[in-house]
């Protein structure tokens, strides 16, 4: 739908295209098709563009995440599906800075960010115990609780980084 890019816009478009990883696309395709049972098609971005497969994916990971899947008859239905998916993955635990914008997928402007979001979703799924073959398991917060007496004792200890105070004196010091 967009015309040709010139100047800085063309440079940005080329830089984004260079960051796109076909190997990651294959891994994402295997994961999504395995989880949903639906074939994406030859063109990865076009297969996800209507948002239906994405909503099925999040509903498999967390049932009931998206209540209504719009039949993608018109463009606004497709955009609404993508928007519902993005809201659902945010509630699932994907960080807002990892989430693509609906137009990145719908207008084919930033496929790299779409890949990054799907990898972040796979990582979150792995963290929640799903058997996912890509992404990393996020670390869990380990809360430590110390007794007040132990905390007071720690204030009186001179740390090894501070060295020793055994030979401390003011000998050789002069006033300004």
UniProtKB/Swiss-Prot annotation:
Q: Does the keyword Repeat apply?
A: yes
Q: What GO terms fall under cellular component here?
A: actin cytoskeleton; focal adhesion
Tissue specificity, per the record, is:
Smooth muscle, and tissues containing significant amounts of smooth muscle.
Q: Which PROSITE patterns match?
A: CALPONIN_2, CH
InterPro entries in UniProt:
Calponin-like (IPR050606), Calponin/LIMCH1 (IPR001997), Calponin_repeat (IPR000557), CH_dom (IPR001715), CH_dom_sf (IPR036872), SM22_calponin (IPR003096)
Repeat (Calponin-like) residue spans along the chain: 158-176
Q: Which Gene3D superfamilies does this chain map to?
A: Calponin-like domain (1.10.418.10)
Task: Cite a single GO BP annotation.
Answer: actomyosin structure organization
Q: Which residues carry this modification: Phosphothreonine?
A: 164, 174
Q: Which residues are connected by disulfide bridges in this protein?
A: none
Q: Which SUPFAM superfamilies match?
A: Calponin-homology domain, CH-domain
Q: Name one GO molecular function term.
A: actin filament binding
List keywords of the entry alphabetically.
Actin-binding, Calmodulin-binding, Phosphoprotein, Repeat
Pfam family of the protein (one): CH
Q: Where in the sequence is Phosphoserine found?
A: 169
Annotated Calponin-homology (CH) domain residues: 22-125
Q: Which family does it belong to?
A: Belongs to the calponin family.
Biological role? Thin filament-associated protein that is implicated in the regulation and modulation of smooth muscle contraction. It is capable of binding to actin, calmodulin and tropomyosin. The interaction of calponin with actin inhibits the actomyosin Mg-ATPase activity.
Q: What is this protein called?
A: Calponin-1
The organism encoding this protein is Meleagris gallopavo (Wild turkey)
Q: Which gene encodes it?
A: CNN1
């Amino acid at each position: 739908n967009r015309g040709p890019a010139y100047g800085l816009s063309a440079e940005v478009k080329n830089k984004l295209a260079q960051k796109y990883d076909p190997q990651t696309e294959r891994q994402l395709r295997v994961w999504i098709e395995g989880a949903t049972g639906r074939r994406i098609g030859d063109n990865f971005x076009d297969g996800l563009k209507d948002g239906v497969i994405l909503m099925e994916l999040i509903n498999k990971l967390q049932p009931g995440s998206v209540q209504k899947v719009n039949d993608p008859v018109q463009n606004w239905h497709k955009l609404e599906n993508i928007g519902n998916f993005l809201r659902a993955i945010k509630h699932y635990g994907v960080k807002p800075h990892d989430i693509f914008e609906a137009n990145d997928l719908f207008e084919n402007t930033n496929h790299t960010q779409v890949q990054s979001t799907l990898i972040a979703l796979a990582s979150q799924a792995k963290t929640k115990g799903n058997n996912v073959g890509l992404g990393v398991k996020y670390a869990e917060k380990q809360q430590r609780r110390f007794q007040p007496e132990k905390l007071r004792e720690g204030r009186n200890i001179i740390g090894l980084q501070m060295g020793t105070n055994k030979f401390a004196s003011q000998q050789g010091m002069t006033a300004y």
